[in-house]
Amino acid sequence: MKFTRTLVLVSTSLLATVATSQAQEVKRDTKKQGEVVLKPITIISHGKDNIEATGGTVLTYKDIEKLQPANVSELFSRQSSIAVSGGGGPSKRIHVLGMEQSNLAVSVDGVPQTATSWHHTGSNVIDPAFLKRVEVEAGAAAADSGFGAAAGAIRYETVNALDLLEPGKTFGARIIGSYGTNGRGFSGSTAAYGLKDGFDWLLMLHGTSGHNYKNGDGTEILGTEPAARNILGKAGYEFDGNRIDIGYERSRDKADRLIKMNMGLPGDTEYPLEVARDSVNIKYTRTDATDMWDPEVQFYYNRNDYWRNDYQNRTNGNMILKEDLYGGKLQNTFTIDYGKITAGIDFGKHDYNTDNYGHNDRRYRKFNTQQVGAFTQGRFEFDNGFSLSTGARYDYSRFADWNDEVFSDSGASVNGTLSYKFNEHIEVFAGASRTWLGYVLGDYGYVHARNNAFYTDPTFSPGRARNYKAGVNFGGADWSAGITLFDTRIAGLPNYDSQKLGNDPEEYRSRGFTLNARYIWNYTTIGATFTKAKVTAGDDPVLPNSGSFMPIGDMATLFIDQEIPDYNMKVGATLAWAGRISDEAATAANFYDQPAYTVVNAYAEWNPPAVKNMTLRVGVENLFNENYYERTSFAPSQNRGGIDAVWAPGRTFTFQTAFKF
């Protein structure tokens, strides 16, 4: 019966795509790719999904330049639907609607990223200094978003030479230096880029050096010193209508950190930790694409390393984790009368290696997963006011564990979002998806503390997810607003108990609504967001233990940006609020109630008329020195002799100077 329902969903989705594709071929839109005409309430624009129109988040290069984020907490500071836990860079965990980003299909420049390796580490995958765009597709994700998009997708895109070069120039450089109080210390970013005879290139370096910060009460928070050393390199070549892009990203963070970076234990001590990531990718596209031939071919390799020295003669976080992820994607996009259809295949292999320094009778473990999938996604705008984004994918998944036991299965995923625009000011939409996740390994770092008898349950099965959303968008020439109701359910996740790897019997669920509004008047932009979410495991609220699912309750943001062209100045501020959380399940598990907090950030930026290529900026985070821990952090409790949160920084000033040549 389950297979029949899936088959019906797949058939319906494919029939919608095929039927629409029978339309006559028309001339390709001559607008620049990615350009969006100001229609703030339509879910499809130029054959692409409008992520914001269905409750998602989009940060453009202009948005990121305004924020100048030093970390991912500041990157998402204006989004109430996205919460980032505190601490040092490697400890930050990103949750979307209360679900950790490992439950979403995460990519950087189209390259799939590994999930969070251990429940005491962070989920940060990219240096904000390299970013030009971020898309967070919450809920029902498109089939071409990638494999395993249980709760949506996060797409990070980094800058290249063509983004930074001034019009008419073939070479450029950018230097940014800053100093911050409260342990932030020094940060420097240098970039050089050029263009010659169809060849463009970019090299960017970014590093930070500081000390542990203090919270709003003046207490030093151990293990929080900035220590990033990152490199981004890109090259592209265009010839005879072809384009080849090659990218390399390298990130290193080496410093003394807490044993478990997301929680404060009694008598906590710092120990050396190194987190490393390397990513290489090559992509082929056409610059003279036609309606029927618009290909994209990409191959990639990712490596992630986690190294904690052998500081104790027992399993307590001292371990080595190594991951290798490699694969590719081949797809083509067809342009027809009413939109676009993308179809293709993707594949990947993920190798895992663990070493617990021999503090058990099984020191080393090696295991892997493999995936191959085929997908199609259509995005259509019709003349009668309807828009439709619908697609399907079919995947094969294989898991070979540390005992050479092999598990394999296959399954289908479908999605669809339909909207109707009553006029230029009102649009309603509804969407749903059913996603097959393959074998989900999740926080595989648990195996470092398991003995040789640890095995995989023979009944271990693939995960699955369901998403539903509906909403209304309103808008005009200078304003927009919307409400989105969402309901996400994920089941079949892994459970690493003391004896075996099996399936968690609970279904995890996040449901609620989001609100957003924005108004632009001359040189002023004002925006606000509000999110209310109930996150449960089975019938019970999830515990605030920094897991893959976290309670977020009520959260809101308010921001304003003001340009003052007569003085070459820009100023702005952001207010973030989180409501109090108190529930019986958390109290019974010895957690304290989570207090409400309000945090204000502000900035001022000036371009001196005498030095037009220089920008001076001063920013302040936590202006009123609030003592708080960010929502989705491990909450204080009475367990283990008293667990404390990793508190967020107190008031921090940052002074920045930037030159562009």
From Swiss-Prot:
Keywords: Cell outer membrane, Membrane, Receptor, Signal, TonB box, Transmembrane, Transmembrane beta strand, Transport. Residues 1-23 form the signal peptide. It is found in: Cell outer membrane. Residues 48-159 form the TBDR plug domain. Its main location: membrane. Heme transporter playing an important role in stationary-phase iron acquisition and required for maintenance of chronic infection in mice. This is Heme transporter BhuA. It comes from Brucella abortus (strain 2308). The gene is bhuA.
